[in-house]
């Protein structure tokens, strides 16, 4: 029975059986929640790693999105990206427990999750919505493939690194043509990921904006460009490109692109509902993860 006084009633634990420490974290959170009489469901990918948990507690990610009102993602930012592309379709809040490297998207310490997570369960948290991008590959006027990205959509060569040629249109207005190793189209969330490595700007996560970052352009005048989030970006791939290219979504999903194709990138109607502990500060995260200097006085 649902407790209307609780901020959340059905909680899903999501992740992959990466290593023994991650499995230990999944199990600790599961028992800690069940001891408080929460209904707890788990990612089906954890079934074999957690044989002591009843089989009916496990389900696939789409079903967890339907059934749960809070998802706890255990792992690094990669796990959060994969979960975000699915869970953004549902009315579910998401928080992360960091078992990865940088952890821009995963707030909770796996060894000390109890106190901050208890505060979140009590309704004491910060909530924000992050948008995703949709990527479509068009060929001869038809959509051949599509997917979504929480961080970035990247146009790049296939198996062999080489220059590629393409034109960029924004809302069907020609912006520029380019010969480069590719192009990164990033959300504000992704501005601290691959885009940052490519020299792109850091965008505050609440900005409704998209950054367009060239990858090793064959010109000295090319610079990153930030456009309004509602703009429709179209990449026209030159027929002169000799090999098949690729569009990568979050570095996890790859769509083949042929010479002469068009790639359409636009804001998804879906939003991921991220929640953070009450003391969350985006600028503290930047200072901590990027090694910025502390206050002088």
Swiss-Prot record:
Enzyme class, broadest EC rank: transferase
Reaction it catalyzes: NAD(+) + ATP = ADP + NADP(+) + H(+)
Keywords for the protein's UniProt record, in alphabetical order: ATP-binding, Cytoplasm, Kinase, NAD, NADP, Nucleotide-binding, Transferase
GO CC terms of this entry: cytoplasm
EC number per UniProt: 2.7.1.23
Compartments, record wording: Cytoplasm
Pfam families per record: NAD_kinase, NAD_kinase_C
A molecular-function term among this protein's GO annotations: ATP binding
Reported cofactor(s): a divalent metal cation
Residues forming the catalytic site: 77
Xref: InterPro entries: ATP-NAD_kinase_N (IPR017438), ATP-NAD_kinase_PpnK-typ_C (IPR017437), NAD/diacylglycerol_kinase_sf (IPR016064), NADK (IPR002504)
Annotated NAD(+) binding sites: 77-78, 151-152, 162, 179, 181, 192-197, 252
Sections of the chain in a coiled coil: none
SUPFAM superfamilies xrefs: NAD kinase/diacylglycerol kinase-like (SSF111331)
BP GO annotations: NAD metabolic process; NADP biosynthetic process
PANTHER family: NAD KINASE (PTHR20275:SF0)
Family, similarity comment: Belongs to the NAD kinase family.
Biological role stated in the UniProt entry: Involved in the regulation of the intracellular balance of NAD and NADP, and is a key enzyme in the biosynthesis of NADP. Catalyzes specifically the phosphorylation on 2'-hydroxyl of the adenosine moiety of NAD to yield NADP.
Protein name: NAD kinase
Gene name in the database record: nadK
């Amino acid at each position: 029975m649902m407790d209307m006084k609780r901020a959340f009633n059905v909680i899903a634990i999501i992740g992959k059986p990466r290593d023994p420490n991650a499995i230990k974290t999944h199990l600790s959170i599961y028992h800690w929640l069940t001891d408080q009489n929460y209904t707890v469901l788990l990612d089906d990918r954890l079934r074999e790693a957690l044989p002591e948990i009843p089989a009916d507690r496990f389900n696939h990610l789409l079903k967890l999105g339907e059934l749960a009102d809070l998802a706890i993602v255990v792992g690094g930012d990669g796990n959060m990206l994969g979960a975000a592309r699915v869970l953004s379709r549902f009315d579910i809040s998401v928080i992360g427990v960091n078992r990865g490297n940088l952890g821009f998207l995963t707030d909770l310490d796996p060894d000390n999750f109890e106190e901050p997570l208890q505060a979140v369960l009590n309704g004491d948290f910060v909530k924000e919505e992050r948008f995703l991008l949709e990527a479509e590959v068009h060929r001869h006027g038809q959509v051949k493939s599509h997917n979504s990205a929480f961080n970035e959509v990247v146009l790049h060569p296939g198996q062999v690194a080489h220059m590629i040629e393409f034109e960029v249109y924004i809302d069907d207005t020609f912006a520029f043509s380019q010969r480069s190793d590719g192009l990164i189209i990033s959300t504000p969330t992704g501005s601290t990921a691959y885009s940052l490595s490519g020299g792109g700007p850091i965008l505050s996560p609440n900005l409704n904006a998209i950054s367009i970052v060239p990858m090793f352009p064959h010109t000295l005048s090319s610079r990153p460009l930030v456009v309004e989030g509602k703009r429709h970006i179209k990449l026209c791939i030159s027929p002169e490109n000799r090999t098949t290219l690729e569009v990568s979504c979050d570095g996890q999903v790859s769509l083949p692109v042929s010479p002469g194709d068009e790639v359409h990138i636009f804001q998804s109607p879906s939003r991921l509902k991220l929640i953070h502990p009450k003391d969350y500060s985006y600028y503290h995260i930047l200072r901590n993860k990027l090694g910025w200097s502390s206050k002088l006085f």
